[in-house]
């Protein structure tokens, strides 16, 4: 299962991902770390599409090894979210603007998501999301058996 935790910078994506990934024994893909490894700091629309594709590729590689993936990144547009193609989307709707004006202008609130986080209480949200995702993973495995 590929889980996307998306939202504006400063919304709590990384904090939540850090709590969820170990609870699900998942591979954690943090966009900042992936950008650092790729040495790609281009935040234009094309750079963001490239980052989304990079995150998708890494997630798919982990899933081929039967791993659950938790990816946290802005994923600011419908196009980047569709490109990443998550099985489960968490929208971090905890702030309305970030410190980066270009990101504020580009960011499109998602219309499709599985879970909407509305406050910065990572422990509570991690518990709720983990419970729901564990059930979905169990159902998915049962269907495959």
Descriptions of predicted regions:
Residues 2:
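Walker A (P-loop) ATP-phosphate-binding motif of ABC ATPase nucleotide-binding domains
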Residues 5:
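Hydrophobic anchor at the beta1->P-loop junction of P-loop NTPases
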Residues 10:
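Walker A (P-loop) phosphate-binding loop of P-loop NTPases
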Residues 13:
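Conserved lysine of the Walker
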Residues 17-61:
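Conserved substrate/cofactor phosphate-moiety recognition/catalytic segment
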Residues 24, 85-87, 112:
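Short, structured coil segments at secondary-structure junctions
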Residues 45-98:
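Glycine-rich phosphate-binding loop used to anchor ATP phosphates in small-molecule kinases
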Residues 83, 92-145:
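Small-molecule kinase domains that catalyze NTP-dependent phosphoryl transfer to phosphate-bearing small molecules
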